[in-house]
């Protein structure tokens, strides 16, 4: 078996360079969309971000949007079974943000709920919130 590089992308529009220290936390595919969490990019007034890509018929990815994670160090996220809500688990701020998702366009909306889970963590300490899942 061999692998062939097909595309190189950054998580930002026009393939802009990521801020030094930014890390990808999690990657998920839902339908024709790929989502990734961007840890430590502070793209939204100190909050980190999620990136959405659209998968073309030939398999290439096109940047679609960056949206706020509504906290810092988005370690994990989960899309509900219906595909219309996303739970974002921000590790360092120990919060779960719920945002709507359009199942047709894949676009994420503005936060509709937020819950703090335990004490906030310390950046780079790997403490705080570590996982979110929908119990459906």
PLM features: residue spans?
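Feature marking well-ordered beta-strand scaffolds used for ligand recognition
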Residues: 1-136
């Amino acid at each position: 078996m061999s692998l062939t590089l097909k595309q190189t992308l950054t998580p930002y529009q026009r393939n802009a360079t990521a801020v030094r220290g930014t890390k990808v936390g999690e990657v998920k595919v839902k339908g024709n969309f790929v989502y990734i969490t961007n840890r430590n990019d502070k793209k939204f007034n100190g909050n980190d971000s999620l990136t959405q890509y659209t998968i073309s018929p030939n398999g290439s990815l096109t940047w679609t949007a960056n949206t706020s994670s509504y906290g810092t160090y988005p370690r994990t996220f989960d899309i509900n079974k219906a595909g219309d809500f996303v739970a974002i688990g921000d590790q360092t701020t120990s919060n779960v943000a719920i945002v709507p998702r359009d199942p047709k366009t894949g676009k994420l909306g503005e936060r509709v709920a937020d819950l703090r889970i335990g004490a906030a963590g310390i950046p780079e300490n790997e403490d705080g919130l570590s996982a979110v899942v929908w119990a459906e």
